[in-house]
């Protein structure tokens, strides 16, 4: 996923957090900020130290990014959102990560339902 699709700066993260619009399941918390007239969505990924060491956290981030890449055509373009991984995610396969991420994105109404379920 291109860097233009990422929320990178702390100020941008804080804007999304301060909106306080969130959804969660057992594996993820997602914070959402609507940004009308934005060309494409932007995502920030946060994986805390409770998940494991740096190698484990980076592996989890790669799984999340890969899942988002597969879902990118279904994600609404006019939003910024932050995906926060919860402990236990490091034990899941890529398919399970994608299923959990799809579930929480549907709860947050980020995914376009017209495309159907993959």
Swiss-Prot record:
GO biological process, one term: tRNA 5'-leader removal
InterPro entries: Ribosomal_Su5_D2-typ_SF, Ribsml_uS5_D2-typ_fold_subgr, RNase_P, RNase_P_CS
Disulfide pairings: none
EC number: 3.1.26.5
Alphabetical keyword list: Endonuclease, Hydrolase, Nuclease, RNA-binding, tRNA processing
Gene3D superfamilies xrefs: 3.30.230.10
GO cellular component term, pick one: ribonuclease P complex
Gene Ontology terms for molecular function: 3'-tRNA processing endoribonuclease activity; ribonuclease P activity; tRNA binding
Transmembrane segments: none
Alphabetical list of PROSITE patterns matching this protein: RIBONUCLEASE_P (PS00648)
Catalytic activity line of the entry: Endonucleolytic cleavage of RNA, removing 5'-extranucleotides from tRNA precursor
Record's function text: RNaseP catalyzes the removal of the 5'-leader sequence from pre-tRNA to produce the mature 5'-terminus. It can also cleave other RNA substrates such as 4.5S RNA. The protein component plays an auxiliary but essential role in vivo by binding to the 5'-leader sequence and broadening the substrate specificity of the ribozyme.
NCBIfam families, alphabetized: rnpA
HAMAP family named in the record: RNase_P
Family per similarity comment: Belongs to the RnpA family.
Subunit structure: Consists of a catalytic RNA component (M1 or rnpB) and a protein subunit.
UniProt-recorded name of the protein: Ribonuclease P protein component
């Amino acid at each position: 996923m291109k860097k233009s699709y990422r929320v990178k700066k702390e100020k941008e993260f804080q804007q999304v957090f301060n909106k306080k619009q969130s959804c969660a399941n057992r594996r993820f918390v997602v914070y959402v900020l609507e940004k009308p007239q934005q060309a494409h969505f932007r995502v920030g990924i946060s994986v805390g130290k409770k998940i494991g060491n740096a190698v484990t956290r980076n592996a989890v981030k790669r799984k999340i990014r890969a899942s988002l890449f597969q879902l990118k055509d279904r994600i609404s373009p006019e939003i910024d959102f932050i995906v926060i991984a919860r402990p236990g995610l490091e034990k899941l396969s890529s398919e399970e990560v994608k299923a959990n991420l799809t579930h929480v994105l549907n709860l947050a109404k980020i995914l376009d339902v017209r495309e159907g379920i993959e």
